[in-house]
């Protein structure tokens, strides 16, 4: 008697329990290999009822789906799957895409943007750097470096305009003047420009990048590797790693034979490699008296896996049963090579593309079946109703090719192309998304811990990490609960699916599965991280913000937030990935103001949360407060409601991001309802008596939603340098706006009228300052108007020592427009600077017309208009 017959006779000594488990539950509960028996009534192709099965191992197979071709690139025959470690050689043919779209070459990013192909490849090393501006009104800059390596694959996503800081050569005329008088920092506004960029995804780094049109380098629509692959013969693994699928190949020579091949690849055959699939299979051996029949079961199929009888020796943890299993396993190892079995070429017998409706099945579901595809319902002539989906004609097969196949990117798989690697699924099948099978109709045994909470407690928008941790928390008590129910299930004859059975000494149920680490999250670029965070939380200012002396602390990320819906870029060519170029602080760099600030209205540090103070009449409030809020391009969802909580915000700094496109949520108020203006974080104006009319005007000015002139009257009692520092820390300077009235009388009437038109509100300095302006101090930021001082004002004959305020009066006096006055105020042009300006600077840098330049130059040279 041979060894196989002796081992087969040992089955007579095995007592079989009434416990039946589906295959996926079995492999997740017990250490492999194990011996089980096919349950009565189970219909599995290639197996007989009550066959003994040795569950050999779980393996991960990576295969390439291919179609047979005839001359002229027509698809014929069934689909096949070729393992990635197939030992045969292939030669690349002329590709369909190269015939339709010949290979193109480009010498700059601008040329790529004009043609805008789907993807390009970098043909040489490219390095480029430029200074990025943090915002239009922020003087901070940061150098942005771009490095591209040869062979990088870039998928084009869109275009955007980004703020950049101009180089010193572009403003050298200003530098010469400003260095001479020591005011080089006053030209920051003119050092900003908009740079068109091409938004791309670099597949090597898996990050989005913005390439300026100025960047030069060689690009191509075909990679160098793919061009080099046109010559010679290559393995299928080399082809899928270095070319884009689909690709046409030919078999140049007779390939090696595999005894387990179900499809014979012959010399001269042509194939179209269409996509790549990775799936997890359970390799088993049907144990018979005269032979061993290898079979495998894919875990990612829509049909139910077979139910198997479990022996009593496994449930009781008997050592003699473990010895029997070990002997059978050794015998099977001698009879067949599982690696050869895993490398076999097989026909795709089930149309997984149509069947894979869910993302889980379509992305990782695999395309292969094997010699054992089961269906417990037994419908169909062969027990596999899915086989009816086979393409029946050339047209249907050709239609399949028109579907959008997922192309293989080298950065996704890299060196992780599994050929037949063994994987351990103990305790992971019900947790890992890679291993969990799709739910069949009778899947009452799947995810028992979730069946109890079927009321929808598991939300689809729960973050990935929290979702995993939630599973881990629930795993322990669920297993304990199921152990207690096992006795009742056994006595009932096991008509329903059983929970995990109790593990004996040899069954080795993995109790450590509760502590399994979550599967790795795909890497995200910093731009994507910032964009995802900014959609759900208030933005964080640049790390280079000039906050001095404010207490800061790191803020943990909120656990859950309502998702902002339908947040899209207003421009179809503008991508959110362009936000990655801004100097955003990373995790741990976000700052929050001290507790004495009002969290109901971020971003400025002027407002106090004290309800008693906020309920008082506000003695002086400048309309520019709310104007600065309206200037911000951040979403206004977080400004204007007292019900918002402090923990909903991560940062309260005031910065302007003009290149962050956001859509306002409907119903969001634009106004900032309450708060005290207080630069020194103390109540400077408590106890000050103000008139009720000024209070009314101030309260109406609170809800100003348009830009008004920036006025620092409330800062007049402080030195000028301190005012400059405070202003630069708070909000960007807004251009001045003149009232619609033309005399002081109308201005006073407008100030005392309770009107809702906030654009016309200008508070006089005497009603805003509690102590009045100190003599000798000059407010270089407040831009007053001729009406404020009467019509008798005349510009001085000597302009060298006058202030910015007087320059503004002078410009209005000679009849220049408010746009010109605003530009001079923004650039802080005083008398000394005005005398240094030339016609070239006024026309080219200030963009003045010839008439304006002539009038201003005559004014500088001493001309005064007659009254």
Curated annotation (Swiss-Prot):
Keyword line: Mitogen, Phosphoprotein
The segments labelled Disordered in the record are: 511-530, 536-594, 735-758
Query: What ranges does the record give for the region CABIT, renumbered to this chain?
Result: 12-322
Presence of keyword Phosphoprotein: yes
- Phosphotyrosine: which positions carry it? 464
Might you name a Gene Ontology BP term for this protein? positive regulation of cell population proliferation
Q: Name one Pfam family in it.
A: CABIT
Q: Where is the composition biased (Polar residues)?
A: 544-554, 569-581
- Key word Phosphoprotein present: yes
What species was this sequence derived from?
Danio rerio (Zebrafish)
Similarity comment: Belongs to the GAREM family.
Bias kind Basic and acidic residues: ranges: 740-749
The SAM domain is annotated at 802-867
Name it: GRB2-associated and regulator of MAPK protein 1
Any one GO MF term held by the record is:
proline-rich region binding
